[in-house]
């Protein structure tokens, strides 16, 4: 059996110390370009296990990966229909440019750990997907000079984003509900700080999600005289919508309409109605946001946004040198189905 090639083998072949070989990979700035290239070439010639990917990265100055940052657990990226659609679109473009995706969940309970993860990540760019405003991980990206594209609009003309007009989209829902005569509403809000098993009412200041805040403002604009309560059953999930709806449906102060700020929460609310033998659109209106595939099956009135196209466009802004736009506003559409109806008298 041939002896394994180690860092010492490479060092002896080049005539340098093992630490110098290590610097060629970890601290390239400490070596001259000629020496670094000589070490990398010899390592590849000897078949040193491990230098190939690092050598390519050093020569090109590219990590070959884009980070996807989101404030939730890792499982969210694989279970939430909106996240799955967005990542599918982003992955199509990443594959075209031979780039990997690095999923980076930034836990709201471990702020420092999230910032450290961003500090250490080997990425060429970052897609900011559903990250809490002000998270230190975002500041760390700026300090590292890593290009970013957000899915939230930013007033800074130098920022890059691919987004919808959250307020105008929600205003379409609000206008629809106002025409149906609704004036007592509950909004189901995702909130990772809320208890996992007990739904709670929130104030506007407790929402903590920039997109959610704009959607609530859009509803308020079209329903100026309405009573609008905010309820959270936890993070953005079917179970959270179920818990939040159960709280209001079992109270003596039942609203005439429930608005899920995502379809998954609205679908959870419809399940809560089903177990109480209530019919959406007749006994109580339920509407959502996103138009995921399950929304059509359930007959859910919602706002359609181009989820997969959003992911594709984020990928273009990050990776495609021929794509010159850096701020892209995507269209939305009100989709009316059977879950919305006139307010009961």
Give, region by region, the residue ranges found by the protein language model.
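Hinge/beta->alpha junction and helix N-cap segments in small-molecule ligand-binding domains
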Residues: 73-84, 104-111, 162-172, 187-244, ...
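Flexible loop/turn connectors
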Residues: 242, 246, 251-345
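Alpha-helical recognition/docking segments in bacterial nutrient-uptake
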Residues: 1-6, 20, 65-68, 73-178
């Amino acid at each position: 059996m041939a002896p394994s090639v180690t860092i010492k083998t490479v060092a002896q072949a080049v005539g340098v110390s093992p630490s110098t070989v290590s610097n060629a990979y970890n601290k390239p700035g400490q070596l001259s370009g000629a020496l670094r290239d000589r070490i990398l070439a010899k390592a590849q010639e000897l078949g040193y296990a491990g230098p190939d990917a690092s050598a390519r990265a050093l020569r090109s100055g590219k990590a070959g990966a884009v980070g996807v940052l989101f404030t939730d657990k890792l499982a969210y990226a694989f279970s939430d229909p909106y996240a799955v659609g967005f990542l599918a679109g982003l992955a199509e473009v990443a594959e075209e440019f031979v780039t990997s995706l690095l999923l980076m969940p930034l836990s709201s309970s471990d702020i420092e750990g999230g910032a450290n993860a961003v500090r250490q990540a080997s990425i060429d760019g970052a897609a900011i997907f559903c990250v809490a405003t002000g998270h230190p991980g975002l500041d760390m990206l700026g300090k590292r000079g890593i290009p970013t594209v957000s899915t939230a609009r930013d007033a800074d003309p130098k920022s890059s984003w691919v987004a919808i007009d959250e307020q105008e989209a929600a205003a379409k829902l609000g206008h629809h509900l106002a025409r149906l005569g609704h004036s007592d509403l509950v909004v189901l809000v995702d909130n990772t700080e809320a208890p996992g098993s007990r739904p709670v009412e929130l104030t506007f200041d407790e929402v903590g999600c920039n997109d959610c805040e704009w959607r609530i403002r859009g509803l308020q604009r079209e329903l100026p005289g309405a009573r609008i309560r905010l309820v959270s059953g936890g993070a953005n999930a079917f179970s959270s919508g179920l818990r939040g709806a159960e709280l209001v449906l079992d109270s003596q102060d039942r609203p005439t309409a429930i608005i899920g700020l995502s379809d998954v929460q609205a679908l959870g609310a419809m399940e809560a109605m089903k177990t109480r033998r209530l019919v959406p659109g007749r006994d109580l209106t339920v509407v959502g946001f996103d138009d995921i595939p399950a929304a059509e099956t359930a007959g859910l009135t919602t706002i359609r946004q181009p989820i997969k196209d959003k992911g594709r466009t984020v990928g273009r802004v990050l990776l495609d040198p021929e794509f010159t736009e850096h701020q892209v506003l995507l269209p939305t559409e009100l989709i009316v189905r059977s879950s919305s109806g006139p307010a009961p008298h």
